[in-house]
């Protein structure tokens, strides 16, 4: 089915207010969920909203909490989210990293005691729109087996890197082949995954999203490489924030809350003039996309460039929402 941005935001806003969230906070949170969905990231927008409400009702998310600065070391700051709303706090933290970068050339904010930030790419994009390189990542509850294991002991720990090119170039990737959100998107659409995304119950690689969602044997991105990246990203976020690791979140909490996140902004224009920057970025993009295609009908893509097209299509034609997901939201 198709809905408008206004319908989507109104539905989110209604549910948030009915759960006791104040009007201003509800409006800002609903706006972010709707913008994420409008951008084509359904897995971490509309599809994720019922799960967000579940955590709100369980008390994992404290809607009136505000992040608090703990330590300041010039270009580096450490904050405590105090279990505030994840997407609103993440936006504030990237804004703060940008402010630090404006003064120091680079800004790093380490955040502890945070909640799920929904679409991580929003915060990298936020920096790139202002002309900064944006880098951020988060840890999570253990939802992926380390390479060579059957039991979940590491997080998918998504990493975002956004470059202020025209259009913005951005990698937004979990350390698994697919996020659990994308497994859900493919399952709801009745599709197999395009490549193997995990193991079945017999230990064979599989493209069946429902099987992987159930047994939690999701495949690390690049096999042992994604497993290793997940571990070191967790270590850095834990140390810099003085927050909880994947092990602590998993063993000490009843659900995924109190996690650790990193936000970095780099002011490129302190290092290179604008025309030179633009020319170098354009040459990189042209060089990559001019490679001979393996399939003449399949264009060579640059990461993140599809979001400009998706946003325009959704604004023109309406936003696609799965019927069952919309029914869940209407019933909340």
Swiss-Prot record:
Q: What terms describe the molecular function in GO for this protein?
A: 3-dehydro-L-gulonate 2-dehydrogenase activity; NAD+ binding
* Chain residues that bind NAD(+): 168-174, 224-225, 304-306
Q: What is its EC number?
A: 1.1.1.130
- Active-site residues, Swiss-Prot/TrEMBL: 44
InterPro entries recorded for this chain? Diketo_gul_Rdtase (IPR023689), Mal/L-sulf/L-lact_DH-like_ah (IPR043144), Mal/L-sulf/L-lact_DH-like_NADP (IPR043143), Mal/L-sulfo/L-lacto_DH-like_sf (IPR036111), Malate/L-lactate_DH-like (IPR003767)
GO CC, sorted alphabetically, is:
cytoplasm
Q: Which UniProt keywords apply?
A: Cytoplasm, NAD, Oxidoreductase
Group of enzyme by EC: oxidoreductase
Q: Which reaction does it catalyse?
A: 3-dehydro-L-gulonate + NAD(+) = 2,3-dioxo-L-gulonate + NADH + H(+); 3-dehydro-L-gulonate + NADP(+) = 2,3-dioxo-L-gulonate + NADPH + H(+)
UniProt xrefs under Pfam families: Ldh_2 (PF02615)
Q: Where in the cell is it found?
A: Cytoplasm
> Quaternary form?
Homodimer.
Family membership: Belongs to the LDH2/MDH2 oxidoreductase family. DlgD subfamily.
Q: What does this chain do?
A: Catalyzes the reduction of 2,3-diketo-L-gulonate in the presence of NADH, to form 3-keto-L-gulonate.
PANTHER family from the xrefs?
Answer: 2,3-DIKETO-L-GULONATE REDUCTASE (PTHR11091:SF3), OXIDOREDUCTASE-RELATED (PTHR11091)
Name of the featured protein:
2,3-diketo-L-gulonate reductase
Species of origin reads Escherichia coli O1:K1 / APEC
Query: Species lineage, top-down?
Result: Bacteria, Pseudomonadati, Pseudomonadota, Gammaproteobacteria, Enterobacterales
State the gene name recorded for this protein. dlgD
């Amino acid at each position: 089915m198709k809905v408008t941005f206004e319908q989507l935001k109104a539905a989110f806003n209604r549910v948030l207010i009915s759960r006791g969230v104040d009007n201003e906070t509800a409006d800002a949170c609903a706006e972010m969920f709707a913008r994420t969905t409008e951008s084509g990231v359904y897995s971490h927008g509309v599809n994720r909203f019922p799960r967000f409400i579940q955590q709100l009702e369980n008390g994992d998310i404290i809607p009136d909490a505000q992040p608090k600065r703990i330590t300041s070391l010039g270009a580096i700051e450490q904050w405590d989210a105090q279990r505030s709303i994840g997407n609103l706090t993440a936006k504030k933290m990237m804004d703060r990293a940008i402010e630090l970068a404006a003064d120091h050339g680079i800004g790093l904010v380490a955040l502890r005691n945070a909640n799920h930030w929904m679409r991580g790419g929003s915060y990298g994009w936020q920096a790139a729109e202002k002309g900064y390189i944006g880098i951020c990542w988060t840890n999570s509850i253990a939802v992926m087996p380390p390479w060579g294991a059957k039991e979940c002991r590491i997080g998918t720990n998504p990493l975002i890197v956004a470059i202020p090119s025209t259009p913005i170039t951005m990698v937004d990737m979990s350390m698994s082949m697919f996020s659990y959100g994308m497994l859900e998107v493919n399952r709801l659409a009745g599709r197999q995954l395009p490549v193997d995304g995990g193991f079945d119950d017999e230990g064979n690689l599989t493209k069946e999203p429902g099987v992987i969602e159930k047994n939690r044997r999701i495949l690390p991105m690049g096999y042992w490489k994604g497993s290793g990246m997940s571990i070191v990203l967790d270590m850095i976020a834990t140390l810099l924030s003085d927050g909880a690791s994947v092990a602590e979140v998993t063993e000490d909490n009843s659900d995924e809350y109190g996690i650790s996140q990193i936000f970095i902004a780099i002011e490129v224009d302190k290092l290179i003039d604008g025309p030179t920057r633009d020319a170098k970025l354009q040459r990189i993009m042209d060089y990559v996309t001019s490679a001979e295609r393996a399939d003449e009908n399949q264009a060579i893509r640059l990461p993140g460039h599809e979001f400009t097209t998706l946003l325009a299509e959704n604004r023109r034609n309406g936003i696609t929402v799965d019927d069952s997901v919309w029914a869940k939201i209407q019933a909340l």
